[in-house]
A protein has these predicted regions:
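Active-site microenvironments of hydrolase-like enzyme catalytic domains
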Residues: 51, 57-101
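Acidic/histidine-rich, surface-exposed loop or edge segments in extracytoplasmic proteins
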Residues: 1-3, 30-33, 92, 96-106
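Solvent-exposed loop/turn segments at secondary-structure junctions
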Residues: 34-38, 69-74, 101-104, 140-143, ...
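Active-site-adjacent substrate-binding region
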Residues: 109-136
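N-terminal catalytic or cofactor-binding beta/alpha core of small enzyme domains
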Residues: 1-62, 71-76, 170, 183
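Structural recognition of the beta-strand scaffold that forms the well-ordered cores
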Residues: 28-30, 63-66, 95-97, 134, ...
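Active-site-adjacent mobile loop/cap segments within catalytic or ligand-binding domains
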Residues: 132-185
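Loop/turn elements at helix/coil->beta-strand transitions in domains of secreted/extracellular proteins
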Residues: 24-27, 59-63, 92-93, 130-131, ...
């Protein structure tokens, strides 16, 4: 269920990703602002302001990741929990969302984001087969115009447990660390 307690929501998943990157010496800014509270309306506009504030202060930022969970259910309302078993534990499957532009969205860097999405998914699948769902490639902005490495990640869905999502955050962070270090960034 939805919570504003940061140790019980997607902020906790972001904590896990940040922990893995920081352990490898990769600089991280993990903003824990709940942009969708108290209302989903305007959440992307509020998060765009936050991202821009950091980009103005730290123009060398190359990657921005927006951490979410999906909301998928059966036609009868049963919540779906996409999982993979990784090293004997249930992990919430991760879906990468990468937007594209039809010329109306001011997102000239979308091909860079898509390449990053494909490389990131390949790294996660090489390390943890079955962890990812197919990339969702769509005409949506979701603040992906901010950096050439801007993605939205869905950690499972509202049917998954927090523990499954947090474990996926750990695995995701390890794979992202490996990808960044392999590219010499």
């Amino acid at each position: 269920s939805r919570s504003t307690e940061q140790d019980k929501n997607m902020v906790r998943v972001g904590d896990e990703i940040a922990k893995q990157l920081e352990a490898a010496g990769i600089g991280v800014i993990h903003d824990t602002t709940l942009h969708d509270y108290p209302s989903y309306n305007g959440a992307y506009e509020r998060s765009a302001e936050t991202i821009q504030k950091y980009l103005d202060e730290y123009p060398s930022i190359k990657i921005t990741i927006d951490v979410h969970r999906d909301a998928i259910e059966e036609s009868d309302g049963t919540r779906i929990a996409p999982v993979a078993e990784i090293d004997g534990k249930k992990a919430a499957q991760i879906m990468i969302i990468s937007g594209c532009d039809d010329g109306t969205m001011n997102m000239p860097n979308w091909p860079d984001n898509l390449r990053f999405a494909a490389a990131f998914q390949s790294q996660m699948e090489a390390d943890y087969p079955g962890l990812t769902r197919p990339i969702f490639f769509c005409y949506r902005l979701y603040n992906m115009n901010k950096t050439p490495g801007s993605l939205l990640l869905e950690f499972g869905a509202h049917g998954n447990s927090l523990e499954e999502a947090v474990y996926s955050g750990e695995l995701c962070g390890k794979a992202l660390t490996e990808l960044i270090l392999s590219q010499g960034e």
